[in-house]
Amino acid sequence: MASEGITEIDSGLIETNYDNVVYKFDDLNLKPNIVRGIFGYGYETPSAIQQRAILPITEGRDVLAQAQSGTGKTATFTISALQRINENEKATQALILAPTRELALQIKNVITAIGLYLKVTVHASIGGTSMSDDIEAFRSGVQIVVGTPGRVLDMIERRYFKTDKVKMFILDEADEMLSSGFKEQIYNIFRLLPETTQIVLLSATMPQDVLEVTTKFMNNPVRILVKKDELTLEGIKQFYINVELEDYKFDCLCDLYDSISVTQAVIFCNTRSKVEFLTNKLREQHFTVSAIHADLPQAERDTIMKEFRSGSSRILISTDLLARGIDVQQVSLVINYDLPANKENYIHRIGRGGRFGRKGVAINFVTDRDVGMMREIEKFYSTQIEEMPADIGALFA
C-alpha cells in the first residue's frame, strides 16, 4: 500500500524509488533464449523504461510504471513475463489486460516474437472471437493470457480460466481501461486472483482511478514515473492549420495532399459518423482509403489493419479506437481531422508517427472554436504546436 504521495512529479525524466538501472540486455540475468529473441526482434539496447522496470518485475516486485506509447513498454512487460514463466508448468501463470482487442493482439504478437525460442504458449482472450477457441486454449493449459476485461472475467466466472497458478497480473494502458467502463470488471478480476499475485501496472497518465488501484491492490510498488512535462514524443513535429470552420476541413485536407508526398497516413476523427463521411468523400476523390471504428466486426477490423500494414491502403481513417498501441511502422503522418475530445488521447494519436526515434509529423485541423482546446493540449504536455509552414512538402521530400 505504498502509493501515498504519487500525485505530481516535479523533476527529472524518470522518478523512481528503485535504484538499479541496467544498460544492457545481457546484464539483466535473462534466460539466454529470451535475449536471443530480443535481439531477433530488433532491439539492441534497453530503452529508459526497460533499463529500470525489467529487473524489479523479474524479481517479483509490484511495479507502477508511467510510460507513453513508443517507449518500449510492451516489450518491458513481455520480457519480464517470459522470464517469470515456468515453461514446464502447463497452467496460466501470467494475465495481461488491455483496453482494446487490437492492442491485446498486438501484445500477443510481441510475446510470440520475443518468445520465439521458448516453449511458452500464449493466447488472446478477447471479445468478438469464438468462445470455443477460448475454452479449448484454457483446457490445454495456456501459460500467458492476453485479453480484454469483459471476456477474461467471463472465462474466470465460467471456470474455464483457472486462476490458482496466476503469479503475474499486468494492466497495460491502465488509465484508459479504468476510465472507460472497465473498472468494475477489473476490480472483480483482482478479487478472483491469488492474494500473492504480482501486480504490474502501466499507464501513460496517472489519474485518480489509477492511483486508487495502487493503494487497494498493490504491495509497496516500485514506482517508475515519467514527468508529465516530458509526455510528448521526441521526433514528432507538431503543426496546426487554422481551418476557421468545420465545413472547410475537407478542402483543406485535399489541398494538403496536393502539396505533400506521403507513403501512408492515419487520420483521426472523433465520431464514427465523421469517419464514414470522410471515407466516402475521399473515395469520391479517388483516394485509396480504409476506415476503422469500434462498431465494425472483429474480422473486418483485422482485415483492414492487415491491408494497411501491407501498404495496399495508403490512408487509414479511425476513431480513438486505434490511438492506443497499434504499431504501424511505416506511418510518417498523423492528421487530427478533429482534435481529440479527451486531451489525454492526443499523445496516443500522434505517437503513431515516430516510434523509437522514427521521425513523424502530426498536423492538427483547428477551427476557431478549437483554439482553446489546442492551447490546453499544449499546456498539458508542455509542448508547442506551431502553425504549419508553407513549405510543408519539404518535410516529406
Swiss-Prot record:
Entries under SMART domains matching the protein: DEXDc, HELICc
EC number of this enzyme? 3.6.4.13
Q: Which GO terms describe its molecular function?
A: ATP binding; ATP hydrolysis activity; RNA binding; RNA helicase activity; translation initiation factor activity
Q: Which InterPro entries match?
A: DEAD/DEAH_box_helicase_dom, Helicase_ATP-bd, Helicase_C-like, P-loop_NTPase, RNA-helicase_DEAD-box_CS, RNA_helicase_DEAD_Q_motif
> What range(s) does the Helicase C-terminal domain occupy?
235-396
Q: Family membership, please give it.
A: Belongs to the DEAD box helicase family. eIF4A subfamily.
Q: What is known of its domains?
A: The Q motif is unique to and characteristic of the DEAD box family of RNA helicases and controls ATP binding and hydrolysis.
Q: What is this protein called?
A: ATP-dependent RNA helicase eIF4A
* The organism of origin for this protein: Candida albicans (strain SC5314 / ATCC MYA-2876) (Yeast)
Q: Which gene encodes it?
A: TIF1
